[in-house]
Each structure stands twice: as structure tokens, then as C-alpha cells.
């Protein structure tokens, strides 16, 4: 595999974008600040591939940050959307497609008895926090360092030594009063959670977390961690919330809660359930969800919620995922990929640790294990930046940050994995010196 990268047109377009949008992008990670180099401007995507506007083709392991689990522009999804768009792009009224997707989600996800569709994962997490507080009559919430729940003020909290229980805001413009009720703990640390419950008796509405961390790199729950959170929240009259925006329908059809056998009270979803279109959802027990307006007093609304195109793409995507052997294929593909990456790094004398669950994977360039965000920050970010640039030259598109999980799809075949591992071999050989 040889270097293919030429990005003249991307450079021109991105230079113009810098004058039009903050940082030249619509979401910060796309600016390549974590890895350096030239951001890629895409032209089209298909299957496991993405093409930039200079004509370069990449094997894509971002998948639009998770939604493209069937591969980009799956023909059955495209056909369904073409038929749906003839009926209109937005109704702003109930449609039968909402019922169908809701039934599919409820049938699949153990915790969900009722569901509300929104437009993004951030919206879902904002709404679920309001619902947690209303249902319990308590204001405080526990989140984990490195777990991302969208960009709403109450979740933008920096954890760590000395501020673990102070709820200090992690972005300018977020008042301390907004985050004062947000408590934080290290991921995989049950004792820290117990301490927070002990210090805040009858005050914590619930615990929210990514059951597999995907926004601090790829970090899995240690045995007993999720089970322990379930016990602690139940004992303290609090709710357990799984943010499955990333893991939902990706690591199994029923999400992380099915995979690990731990059922939360509420769940947030997104990405996969929209088949590549903007979507989010939150759901849970009927007694809790019945508090959401107009059934109850907890207000939440959205102009484009339940959008017929998003519902259509979501329905077709879930139909494809429900076919026999789907998750076995994803597991096999991703396991082979991450095992090959780790072996390649070790062959070149580069410290690495990583892993995968179904169609989700990640690695850190450091000694392991990595169990939380503090340990993740020992990753050699400079070396990762070099690796990212070398992989781009060889036609492989990884997340432009060491703190983002990677994704495979049903469209990734043995051929793509072979070519990817060849690119890793060459890239590790270059950067080791």
C-alpha cells in the first residue's frame, strides 16, 4: 500500500470554511486539532469507504461517528428514503412511522417500555436529566469522568482530583450554579460512587453513564461495575440511566444492557436508530415516561422530532440488523481488526493496549490496562497524531482523536481488514523511530 494523499482542494475549501464557521467546522473534532494535519473534506460515502473532494478513497472507521453500522448509503436504506421523501420531508404531526420504530425499539431494548423521539443525543440526555429529577424529586446527578452526554450545560463538567464533587464547569459560559448539582466519579470506581451517595443522602436523582465509554477512547466496564451501580441506585432510591447513544443497536441488538445483562431505569439512544439521519430518543419504564408531556408535567418538545425520513432510515436499518448472523459477523470482523492492530504495534516495539465489543473498538498507545479517563490520558497523543497522518496517507480514515472509539460495519469485508492491517504495519514501522 502506497501513499495516496493529495489534498489541494480540501485545503482550499477548509481555508474558506475558517472564515465562515468557528474553526471551519460544525463540530470541533472534525478540525483535526488533536492529531494535526489537514482536515479532510468529504465528497461522498459508500459501503466501508469515503471519498474526499480531491478524489482520495479511504477505508472509513468512523462511520459518521457511529450511525453507519450497515455501511454508508446502504441500498435498501436509500431506496426506502427515496420512497419516503416523495411524501414530504417533515410533517410536524404524528405519523405511523413513529409507531413502527417505537415498537421496534421497545421490543429490542430491555429497559424501554415507552419511548420519546428527539433530534439528537444531546437532546435525549437533556430531557432524561429533567425527567430523572422530576421523578425522584432530587436535583443531584452522578456522571463519570470522560463519559460524554452531549454539550448541554449540566453535563459539561470536568472531573478529577480536587474537583470530583464540586461540579466545576468545563467550558466558558457555563455558570457554576448550573453544574453545582452534577457530581463526578472515575469510571469503573464503585467505591467513589458509594462515597458520593454517602455524602449526599436522599439528594441524588440518579447515575448516568456510557456503559462502554466511547468518548474518552474505548473503555469497557470491569466485571461487577454495572451490576454494582444497579444495586447502589436501587438501594438509594435513585435511577440508573444508560447513555446508549453510541452502544445502542451497535454492540448487540438490545444494546449494552442486553450484552451485559444489566437493566437501567432509563436509556438514551441515537446514531444507529436514525440510519444516518439526525435522531435521538429516550425511554424507560412506563411509570417514569408517563411523566413526560403531554401525559405528565415534564415538558419536552421538538419541531422535527419523529421526522418521517429519520424514522424511515431507522426502521430499515433495524430490519437489516435483525437478520440472522449480523452481530456474529460484526464481532468477528472487529476482533480480527483490533487483534491485528495490537500485534502490529507490538511487533514494532510500540506500547499499546486496546479491545473491541462487537462493532466498536479502540486502542491507546500506552501501557495498559486503561480503566478510566485519567489512565486514558497516559496515551502518547503525539505518537497517535503521527499514526493518524500516516494512516491517512495509506487510505485509512481513523477518528482524528485518541479519545474517540472506532466503528466497523457490515460492509467491512476481509479485504478491507487486510488492507487496513497492512497500512498499520507500514505506519507503525514509520513512526516507531
Curated annotation (Swiss-Prot):
Keywords: Chlorophyll biosynthesis, Cytoplasm, Isomerase, Porphyrin biosynthesis, Pyridoxal phosphate
Location of N6-(pyridoxal phosphate)lysine modifications: 271
Gene3D superfamilies for the chain: Aspartate Aminotransferase, domain 1, Type I PLP-dependent aspartate aminotransferase-like (Major domain)
Matching InterPro entries: 4pyrrol_synth_GluAld_NH2Trfase, Aminotrans_3, Aminotrans_3_PPA_site, PyrdxlP-dep_Trfase, PyrdxlP-dep_Trfase_major, PyrdxlP-dep_Trfase_small
One of the protein's GO biological processes: protoporphyrinogen IX biosynthetic process
Entry GO CC: cytoplasm
Top-level taxon of origin: Bacteria
Catalytic reaction(s) noted: (S)-4-amino-5-oxopentanoate = 5-aminolevulinate
Enzyme class: isomerase
The protein's annotated pathway: Porphyrin-containing compound metabolism; protoporphyrin-IX biosynthesis; 5-aminolevulinate from L-glutamyl-tRNA(Glu): step 2/2; Porphyrin-containing compound metabolism; chlorophyll biosynthesis
Cofactor: pyridoxal 5'-phosphate
GO molecular function terms attached to this record: glutamate-1-semialdehyde 2,1-aminomutase activity; pyridoxal phosphate binding; transaminase activity
EC number: 5.4.3.8
Subcellular location field: Cytoplasm
This protein's record includes keyword Transcription: no
Assembly description: Homodimer.
Family: Belongs to the class-III pyridoxal-phosphate-dependent aminotransferase family. HemL subfamily.
Name of the molecule in the record: Glutamate-1-semialdehyde 2,1-aminomutase
UniProt source species: Prochlorococcus marinus subsp. pastoris (strain CCMP1986 / NIES-2087 / MED4)
Amino acid at each position: 500500500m502506497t501513499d495516496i494523499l493529495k489534498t489541494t482542494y480540501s485545503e482550499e475549501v477548509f481555508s474558506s470554511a475558517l472564515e465562515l464557521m468557528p474553526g471551519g467546522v460544525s463540530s470541533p473534532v472534525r478540525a483535526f486539532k488533536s492529531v494535526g494535519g489537514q482536515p479532510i473534506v468529504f465528497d461522498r460515502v459508500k459501503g466501508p469507504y469515503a471519498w474526499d473532494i480531491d478524489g482520495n478513497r479511504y477505508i472509513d472507521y468512523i462511520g459518521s461517528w457511529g450511525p453507519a453500522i450497515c455501511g454508508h448509503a446502504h441500498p435498501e436504506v436509500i431506496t426506502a428514503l427515496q420512497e419516503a421523501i416523495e411524501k414530504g420531508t417533515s410533517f410536524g404531526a404524528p405519523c405511523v412511522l413513529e409507531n413502527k420504530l417505537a415498537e421496534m425499539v421497545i421490543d429490542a431494548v430491555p429497559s424501554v417500555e415507552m419511548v420519546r423521539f428527539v433530534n439528537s443525543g444531546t437532546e435525549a440526555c437533556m430531557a432524561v436529566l429533567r425527567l430523572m429529577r422530576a421523578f425522584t424529586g432530587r436535583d443531584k446527578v452522578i456522571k463519570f469522568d470522560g463519559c460524554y452526554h452531549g454539550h448541554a450545560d449540566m453535563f459539561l463538567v470536568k472531573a478529577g482530583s480536587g474537583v470530583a464533587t464540586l461540579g466545576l464547569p468545563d467550558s466558558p459560559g457555563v455558570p457554576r450554579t448550573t453544574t453545582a448539582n452534577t457530581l463526578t466519579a472515575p469510571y469503573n470506581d464503585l467505591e467513589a460512587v458509594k462515597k458520593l451517595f454517602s455524602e449526599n443522602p436522599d439528594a441524588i436523582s440518579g447515575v448516568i453513564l456510557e456503559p462502554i465509554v466511547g468518548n474518552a477512547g474505548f473503555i469497557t466496564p470491569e466485571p461487577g461495575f454495572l451490576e454494582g451501580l444497579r444495586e447502589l441506585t436501587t438501594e438509594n432510591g435513585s435511577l440508573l440511566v444508560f447513555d446508549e447513544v453510541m452502544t445502542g443497536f451497535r454492540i448487540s441488538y438490545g444494546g449494552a444492557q442486553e450484552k451485559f445483562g444489566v437493566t437501567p431505569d432509563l436509556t438514551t439512544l441515537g446514531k444507529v436508530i436514525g440510519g444516518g439521519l439526525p435522531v435521538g430518543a429516550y425511554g424507560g419504564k412506563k411509570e417514569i415516561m408517563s411523566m413526560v408531556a403531554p401525559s405528565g408535567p415534564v415538558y419536552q418538545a421538538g419541531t422535527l422530532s419523529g421526522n418521517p425520513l429519520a424514522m424511515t432510515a431507522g426502521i430499515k436499518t433495524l430490519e437489516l440488523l435483525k437478520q440472522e448472523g449480523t452481530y456474529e459477523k460484526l464481532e468477528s470482523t472487529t476482533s480480527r481488526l483490533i487483534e491485528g492492530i495490537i500485534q502490529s504495534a507490538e511487533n514494532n516495539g510500540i506500547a499499546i493496549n486496546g479491545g473491541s465489543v462487537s462493532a466498536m473498538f479502540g486502542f491507546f498507545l500506552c501501557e495498559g490496562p486503561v480503566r478510566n479517563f485519567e489512565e486514558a490520558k497516559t496515551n502518547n497523543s503525539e505518537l497517535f497524531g503521527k499514526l493518524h497522518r500516516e494512516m491517512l496517507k495509506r487510505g485509512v480514515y481513523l477518528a482524528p482523536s485518541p479519545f474517540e472509539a472506532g466503528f466497523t460495519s457490515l460492509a467491512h469485508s476481509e479485504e478491507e481488514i487486510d488492507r487496513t492491517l497492512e497500512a498499520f504495519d507500514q505506519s507503525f514501522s514509520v513512526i516507531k523511530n
